[in-house]
Regions:
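Alpha-helix boundary/capping detector
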Residues: 43-47, 106, 126, 147-149
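Acyl-donor binding region in acyl/amide transferases
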Residues: 68-141, 231-276
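C-terminal "cap" of GNAT-fold acetyltransferases
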Residues: 137-159
Length: 276
């Protein structure tokens, strides 16, 4: 038996990797099996290698990890979005995950949407892994009352600051002209990522908002409105991304409330590691 080889995928290995994942995962993942998603996330550069790292022994794949680039730096930040090991080879999966930063020369390796029962594996690797809180900002009920939200007894809206407006960014060119605000968040998302993710995504559409003060760009807030037709009853607004310093976020509370009101939404929600 030969030594275990940990390496990046090569051009033309797409079908082999997809077959391995489909054979060893308990569901057919849309990111792998829908061509539009696969090309957007893993194969967006024609002729290049798909964005996967592999653990291989005697020519057989034992683990595959698909990654998403957050920026185009020579030392990029990445997300691991698919991590599948062959049955009986979980240890190999841990070895591959531990080797990813070196294989990619990555500054930050992150992972979201992990299963709760895998947190212990990330802890073993020295990562921080935990459940993200889910935050809500209530709007107002319609004539039929609350249809999606179930407000508790202590759900009166908290007061918010209202000193910074939101200005819509109409397209990717306008985003490039504005540039990037300072942000300490990781993974670091550059303009290439933001333009692709929020102006060229194959399915959902997003609203990108600039937060400015005295001519200076402080942040971007990205929202998505889920329509009444999509929910079956009332609209919902989601704050899906925030690029900027944490101290700016509370200052757009009034502007977010206006978005909520203008959309006729019952609530605005977001997942976040912590809102100051």
């Amino acid at each position: 038996m030969s030594d275990l080889v940990l390496r990046l995928a090569r051009p033309g290995e797409d079908a082999r990797i997809a077959d391995f994942i489909n054979q060893n995962f308990d569901m057919r993942l849309p990111l792998i099996n829908r061509a539009d998603f696969y090309q957007f996330y893993y194969a967006h550069t024609p002729g290049a290698a798909p964005q996967f790292a592999l653990a291989e022994q005697d020519g057989e794949i034992l683990c595959a990890a698909g990654y998403i680039l957050a920026n185009q730096s020579e030392t990029p930040d990445i997300w691991v979005s698919v991590w599948v090991a062959a049955k009986g080879h979980n240890g190999v999966g841990l070895e591959l995950m531990d080797a990813l930063s070196g294989l990619l020369n990555a500054r930050v390796v992150a992972c979201n949407n992990i299963r709760a029962n895998t947190c212990v594996l990330y802890h073993f690797l020295g990562w921080q892994a935990e459940r993200l809180p889910h935050y809500y900002r209530l709007g107002a009920p319609g004539a039929k009352g609350w249809q999606l939200a179930v407000p508790g007894s202590n759900s009166a809206p908290l007061p918010v600051q209202d000193d910074l407006p939101l200005t819509r960014v109409p397209d990717a060119a306008a985003l490039a002209e504005l540039g990037l605000p300072h942000s300490s968040h990781t993974p670091h998302k550059d303009l290439w990522y933001l333009q692709r993710r929020y102006f060229a995504y194959p399915h959902q559409s997003y609203d990108v908002w600039a937060v400015q003060e005295a001519g200076a760009l402080l942040a971007y807030a990205i929202t998505r409105t889920i329509t009444a037709a999509e929910t079956g009853c009332v609209p919902v607004v989601r704050l899906v991304d925030f690029i900027g310093d944490d101290a700016v976020l509370p200052r757009i509370g009034g502007a977010l409330d206006k978005l909520l009101h203008d959309a006729g939404a019952e609530y605005l929600d977001c997942y976040n590691a912590g809102i100051p």
